[in-house]
Amino acid sequence: MSESESEKAIWTPLKIIQWAVPYLTQKGIFHARFDVECLIAHALKMDRLKVYLQFDRPLDPDELTVIRELLKRRALHEPIQYILGTREFFGHSFKVGPGVLIPRPETEQLVELAIEHLKDIPEKKRLVLDLGTGSGCIAISVAKALPCQVWAVDVSENALQVAEENAINNGVSSILWRKGNWFEALKPQDISQFQLILSNPPYIPLNEKPQLEPQVRDFEPKEALFGGESGLEAYENLALSLHQRLLPGGMALLELHANGLNRVLPLFEKTGLRGTAYPDLQGHPRVLKLEN
């Protein structure tokens, strides 16, 4: 849809959809229909389903300009979540943008397991550490589910700013934010051991980079995606002291690469931790539970 085309024709949401879906599909965008509807709704500042009620409403020039710019961004494979500025996770809305990893549905399993574990722990002993918090989706979802004290760590100042904003927007005030690399980010006045340690670390091997979708490979933060040549760098760092950071009877939950279990588990077994893997909906080991 060029500017000259938009000036001559009367464009409606339906006509935009009929034109833009094949256009984005040709550009290699999956779920193009859904994305187009979301972008129209975003431009018109309404719920996506309400767009259906206004399929035949003529769009004014300003609305067309906004929609055209949004479609251009999506055609370049910019993630739809970055364009919209939000991502739903565990029933909550999280702000996301460049420099912040987009929460994945697979990570909700880790949150579910965390909440189940904490239910059996007295409230005062619910001491939780989230390593590599990103948008804060894990820490905030756990803190919203039940009373607990959470420390959330990330090496990215940008990610921490977004995470803190997400906590405010979700009504969570029980999280202490720490900038730094893994356990090194904790301050001297912080506690040294936790009942529950959570992490969705970077675990994609660098040799898989060419196979990733452009919207992931070219836009999401590399430090949150790639775990070095082997994909194990983050786990190797965690294994150095994770066993010392767990309270007696404590537990860690780590997200895994679909093929990562047999390479990750031995790193922690060497330190005396016992591991149990939980499969995702595709049957791949997705969450590793570690206990002392």
Put a short name on every predicted segment:
Residues 103, 130, 152, 227, ...:
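Conserved SAM-binding loop
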Residues 41-117:
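Conserved AdoMet
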Residues 109-211:
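Conserved SAM/SAH cofactor-binding pocket of Class I
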Residues 203-233:
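Mobile active-site "lid"/loop adjacent to the S-adenosyl-L-methionine
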Residues 39, 77, 107, 138, ...:
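Residue-level signal for inorganic ion chemistry
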Residues 1-46, 50-52:
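Non-catalytic accessory regions of SAM-dependent methyltransferases
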Residues 229-290:
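Conserved Class I SAM-dependent methyltransferase catalytic core
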Residues 24, 118, 167, 242, ...:
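Conserved hydrophobic residues forming the short capping helix/wall of the S-adenosyl-L-methionine
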